[in-house]
Amino acid sequence: MTHNPNIIWHPAAISKSDRQSLNGHKSCVLWFTGLSGSGKSVLANAVDEKLYRKGIQSYVLDGDNIRHGLNKDLGFQTGDRIENIRRIGEVAKLFVDSGQMILTAFISPFREDRDMVRALFPKGEFFEIYVKCPLHVCEQRDPKGLYKKARNGEIKHFTGIDSPYEAPLSPDFIIESDQTSISDGADLIINALQNRGII
């Protein structure tokens, strides 16, 4: 879709830096990516809880939850997956512009799509977190029973089974969820954010 020259951008009266100053912290997106069952949502919510306890303005966008509303019109074909991530990238940008920390938990299987979202943000506002977990461990966990359905042919285009997952080449963080507890993984991320002066 091309840009319509008749639609004009209206500048905000209050800047992002003003909102960050009011909140007492910087804003950024923590983009959790990994296979289904790797622990993205659980880890994102654990980080969110720790941020909340520190008085940080934060919010989690979860891949499943978003498909109940904003993206309920999208399926799992390649084009729909791309649009799913594009929309979330734009929503995440709005949150960051509002001065908040936004945590997104989406499989987001394609590098090109994740790079597309990264390009929306200046350096230091987008952090890719690879929640790494072997496929066989994710299948053993199978919290939603989706791997079993995919193996039985009941679900098509399922990431890791009949649709690829492209692991990040240079993520900002790697949390190996089969070797690191959720609490320890969340602490690693919180400590890194503090060391970088984000919070």
Curated annotation (Swiss-Prot):
| The entry's keywords | ATP-binding, Kinase, Nucleotide-binding, Phosphoprotein, Transferase
> Could you mention a single GO BP entry for this protein?
sulfate assimilation
The EC number(s) given in the record are 2.7.1.25
Active-site feature positions: S108 (phosphoserine intermediate)
Q: Name one Pfam family in it.
A: APS_kinase
Q: What does the record give as its pathway? A: Sulfur metabolism; hydrogen sulfide biosynthesis; sulfite from sulfate: step 2/3
Reactions accelerated catalytically: adenosine 5'-phosphosulfate + ATP = 3'-phosphoadenylyl sulfate + ADP + H(+)
The reply on keyword Nucleotide-binding is yes
Query: Is Protein transport given among the entry's keywords?
Result: no
One example GO MF annotation? ATP binding
Q: Which residues bind ATP?
A: G34, L35, S36, G37, S38, G39, K40, S41
Q: Which family does it belong to?
A: Belongs to the APS kinase family.
The task this protein performs is described as: Catalyzes the synthesis of activated sulfate.
* Protein name as catalogued: Probable adenylyl-sulfate kinase
Gene behind this protein: yisZ
